[in-house]
């Protein structure tokens, strides 16, 4: 006898740098807690982000921009991701890095516009009318062929549908008769017909016929409940970029050339402004009719100092357009030269006229106790058992070097502790791995001391 254990099929995800961030960690009054939802400290920045989330939810923030500025390792990206978590899945959130705009295939401004359109959602509400039930009658009505001759054409189809609540007789278009034939619909089948599109779907055979045959490959379904005619509201969330792509890529024909074109990987094409304007017209028409509503999302541009002067000029125009998302920038630069210029120095590497339009949120470096809390949180997220003395040693390393370096030492220290036959990371493991790996400051010091031995 063979007995096998059923293994769990729970989806495991890689633990990333910000896996522990679950939200902004604010109370019901919008006041930040010292340690909540995976964030520690940065109370002012989190409170400001909470106000931004409220503005986004009330749709009063679109077309405005926010800048998260602070030294490296102070939680700028974590706050941006926490904003995304707070907004939920229904609001589009599009993260990108400043260097992504440089491509050999398409223009920088095109990449920016593409991400702008990805950050703007459209919620389409559609009322679908559906006829559902068991087929009690299926009669095609024939008429004389209008073209003459002896052939007959089908003018309409009379179909009877039955549910637990009642029956209805419908007169259908001849085009639906073809769909009924394709689905191989017979009397006794349970089907549904969409009134708007005329789509027919056979769900299976009614379970009242289950005893009809001994050998049967049919799937038997119960008689539908409720009325034959049902109205159902379907809500669909799409982004403007989805609409652009759907209309920019026409479907190929049946000839050999179109098949070859589909097999060969096409070069990335630019979506024209004309097409976008046409889509905007259709979207505005839908909004006026009340069919759709616009959902301004968030475009997060990390390392914004990597953009050049052309991109910043384009951002000006885009932020002032009628359909614009909320843009969040993040940078760790102080005063530096604006990319694309020779000698124009500006705060954060952003032109002054754009800086003037931004709300700036500052993130401050963490103190020793906050670093300790973050390291505890990361150890918990990675499922590691760490002694208090080891956490204290790591906190001191993080205070002297960087928080990222201290967090990165956790996994090598765990490996070292496993090799030594322990289950808990001790201070000795931390000291040992700190001696094996260098941080940026110590590495720079070695370079300075042994400058002559390296190639220039």
UniProtKB/Swiss-Prot annotation:
Give the UniProt keywords, A-Z: Activator, ATP-binding, Cell cycle, Cell division, Chromatin regulator, DNA damage, DNA recombination, DNA repair, Helicase, Hydrolase, Nucleotide-binding, Nucleus, Transcription, Transcription regulation
- Where it mainly occurs, coarsely classed, is nucleus
User: What molecular functions are annotated in GO for this chain?
Assistant: ATP binding; ATP hydrolysis activity; ATP-dependent activity, acting on DNA; helicase activity; transcription coactivator activity
Species for this entry = Aedes aegypti
Q: What is its EC number?
A: 3.6.4.12
Q: Which family does it belong to?
A: Belongs to the RuvB family.
What gene name is listed for this protein? pont
User: What's this protein's name?
Assistant: RuvB-like helicase 1
- Record's function text: Acts as a transcriptional coactivator in Wg signaling. Proposed core component of the chromatin remodeling Ino80 complex which is involved in transcriptional regulation, DNA replication and probably DNA repair.
Top class in the EC scheme: hydrolase
Assigned GO CC terms: nucleus
Task: Please name the SUPFAM superfamilies in this protein's record.
Answer: P-loop containing nucleoside triphosphate hydrolases
Its quaternary organisation is:
Forms homohexameric rings. May form a dodecamer with rept made of two stacked hexameric rings. Component of the chromatin remodeling Ino80 complex.
- Superkingdom is Eukaryota
Q: What lineage, starting at the top, does this entry show? A: Eukaryota, Metazoa, Ecdysozoa, Arthropoda, Hexapoda
Q: Mind telling me which CDD domains this protein's record contains?
A: HFD_SF
Q: Which reaction does it catalyse?
A: ATP + H2O = ADP + phosphate + H(+)
Cellular localisation: Nucleus
User: What does the record list as GO biological process?
Assistant: cell division; chromatin organization; DNA recombination; DNA repair; positive regulation of canonical Wnt signaling pathway; regulation of cell population proliferation
Query: InterPro entries from the entry?
Result: AAA+_ATPase (IPR003593), P-loop_NTPase (IPR027417), RuvB-like (IPR027238), RuvB-like_C (IPR041048), RuvBL1/2_DNA/RNA_bd_dom (IPR042487), TIP49_P-loop (IPR010339)
Q: Which SMART domains does UniProt cross-reference here?
A: AAA
Q: Where does ATP bind?
A: 70-77
Q: Which Pfam families match?
A: TIP49 (PF06068), TIP49_C (PF17856)
């Amino acid at each position: 006898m063979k007995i096998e254990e059923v293994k769990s099929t729970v989806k495991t995800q890689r633990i990333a740098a910000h896996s522990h961030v679950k939200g902004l960690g604010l109370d019901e009054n919008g006041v930040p807690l010292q340690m909540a939802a995976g964030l520690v400290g940065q109370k002012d920045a989190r409170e400001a982000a909470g106000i931004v989330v409220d503005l986004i939810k009330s749709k009063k923030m679109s077309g405005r921009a926010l800048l998260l500025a602070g030294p490296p390792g102070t939680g700028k990206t974590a706050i941006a991701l926490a904003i995304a978590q707070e907004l939920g899945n229904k609001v589009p959130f599009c993260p990108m890095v400043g260097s992504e705009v440089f491509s050999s295939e398409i223009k920088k401004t095109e990449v920016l516009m593409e991400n702008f359109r990805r950050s703007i959602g459209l919620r389409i509400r559609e009322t679908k009318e559906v006829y559902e039930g068991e087929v009690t009658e299926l009669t095609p009505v024939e008429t004389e062929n209008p073209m003459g001759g002896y052939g007959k054409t089908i003018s309409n189809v009379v179909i009877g549908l039955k549910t637990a609540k009642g029956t209805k007789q419908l007169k259908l278009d001849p085009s639906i008769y073809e769909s009924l034939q394709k689905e191989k619909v017979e009397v006794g089948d349970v089907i549904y017909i969409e009134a708007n599109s005329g789509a027919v779907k056979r769900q299976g055979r009614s379970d009242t016929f289950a005893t009809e045959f001994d050998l049967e490959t049919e799937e038997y379904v119960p008689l539908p409940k409720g009325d034959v005619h049902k109205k159902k509201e379907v809500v669909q969330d799409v982004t403007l970029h989805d609409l652009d792509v759907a209309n920019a890529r026409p479907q190929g024909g049946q000839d050999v050339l179109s098949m070859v074109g589909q097999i060969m990987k096409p070069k990335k094409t630019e979506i024209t402004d004309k097409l976008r304007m046409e889509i905007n017209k259709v979207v505005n028409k839908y909004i006026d009719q009340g069919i759709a509503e616009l959902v301004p999302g968030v475009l997060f541009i990390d390392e914004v100092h990597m953009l050049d002067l052309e991109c910043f000029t384009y951002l000006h125009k885009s932020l002032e357009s009628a359909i614009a998302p909320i843009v969040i920038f993040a940078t760790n630069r102080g005063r530096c030269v604006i990319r694309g210029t020779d000698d124009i120095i500006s705060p954060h590497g952003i032109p002054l006229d754009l800086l003037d339009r931004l709300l700036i949120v500052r993130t401050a470096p963490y103190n020793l106790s906050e670093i300790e809390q973050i390291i505890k949180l990361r150890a918990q997220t990675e499922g590691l058992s760490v002694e208090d003395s080891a956490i204290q040693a790591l906190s001191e390393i993080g205070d002297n070097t960087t928080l990222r370096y201290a967090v990165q030492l956790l996994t090598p220290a765990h490996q070292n502790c496993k090799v030594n036959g322990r289950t808990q990371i001790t201070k000795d493991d931390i000291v040992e791995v700190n001696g094996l790996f260098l941080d940026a400051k110590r590495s720079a010091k070695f370079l300075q001391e042994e400058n002559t031995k390296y190639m220039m």
